[in-house]
Amino acid sequence: MTPKQETQLKKLGPFSIAQAEKIGISHQELSRLVKEEKIHRMERGVYIHTDASFPREIDFQIACKKFGPKSAVGGLTALFYYNLADQVPGHTWMLVPPEKRATSKVYRLIRTKTPLNVGIIEINGYRIVSIERAIIEAFKLATKLGERTAIKAARIAIKNELTTLKKIGKMAKELGLDSYLTKHFEAIVGAIEE
C-alpha cells in the first residue's frame, strides 16, 4: 500500500472492497493488510483504516455500505436519532428495496416499495430519512413500532418546531402514504392541542 493509497483509505472512513479496488488495492492485498492489522474488518465486505477517525454514526455508515446506495437508515433508529422516541433500538433499522436480504441479526430490514430517493438526507457517508419521512414511516410501521410511538413522535416533532403538520402531509403525499396520516390525523392534532 502506497502512502497515497493509505491517505485515501483514511479519508474514506468505512469502505467496501470495490472502493479499495478503485484506488488500486486488490482483494488479496486487503486480506494481507487485515492480517498485518493496518486495516480493520468491520464486518463482511466493510473495512476501515486503523488510523481513520470513527464518527458517532459509524454504524449507519457501515449499514449503508453493506446494503448499497438505495438503502437508508429508518424506522425506530431514525426516530431515536431525531430524539422522537424514548426506546433505544436493539437493531439498526434500514429501509431497503424489496429484493435485499440480510443474515446479520444486527439489522432490521424494512423492505419497501416506496421511493428510496424521496425524503432521504445524505450526511457524512450515510443516508437517513428526514424527520417528516421518519414520522410517516412510523405510522406505516405502527404494527411493529406501535401507534403510540408514532403519534408521540409526530407530537414531539411539531411541538419542538422540528417540522410542521403541513410538511408531514406533503411528505405523505409524495410517498403515496397519505392514508396513514389521514387515519391518525385526529390523534396527532388532539395531542398537539393539549
Feature roles, as predicted:
Residues P3-I25, E29, V34, M42-E194:
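Nucleic-acid-binding surface
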Residues E37:
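Glycine-centered, phosphate/nucleic-acid-interacting loop/turn motifs that mediate DNA/RNA or nucleotide
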